[in-house]
Amino acid sequence: MLKKLFTVSILFFLTACSREVTNYPNAKYKITDKEVKKYILELNNREQCIYPQLAELSYEEAEAQVYSKQSDAEKKTWDYMSNRLLSEIIGDNYAFLEQDEDSANYFIEKHNRLNNQKAKVDPKACALFKEDFESFLEGAKGCECSK
């Protein structure tokens, strides 16, 4: 009996400690850790390119000092830029995230689990991104369309 309890306990422990997202077995597309890590690193680089002060802030501080103060145009621009980046990384699979709720939730859960990478901002890439960001932001400011 004790041996059975020990075996069940070990199995439960290993299952509980699994790093894989298992809540969405019917997801049509399951983004890989490698893809999510690449997305997080690139997005963090781009955010810190535009908002260098993010490098020293916790998420709560960043929310209070940066994200909560973004204009609607800035939010729209970040939505566009982050979606475009994800589409560049996963290609045609991006359609699954738009159309399949389980695939989208799988991505969100995996993103939340892996989002702890530090940015490594490349000055040349940053300059190019800033131009792109500013250009789209100007267009978003002039748009009276819904979010």
Predicted regions located by residue number:
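Hydrophobic alpha-helical membrane context
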Residues: 15-16, 135
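Polar/charged side chains located within well-ordered beta-strands of beta-rich proteins
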Residues: 9, 46-47, 143
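Short N-proximal segments of mature Sec-exported proteins
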Residues: 24-93
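Sec-dependent N-terminal signal peptides
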Residues: 5-14
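Compact alpha-helical subdomains of small soluble proteins
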Residues: 63-147
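Bacterial signal peptide processing site
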Residues: 18-20
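N-terminal cationic leader/targeting segments used for protein routing and processing
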Residues: 4-5, 113
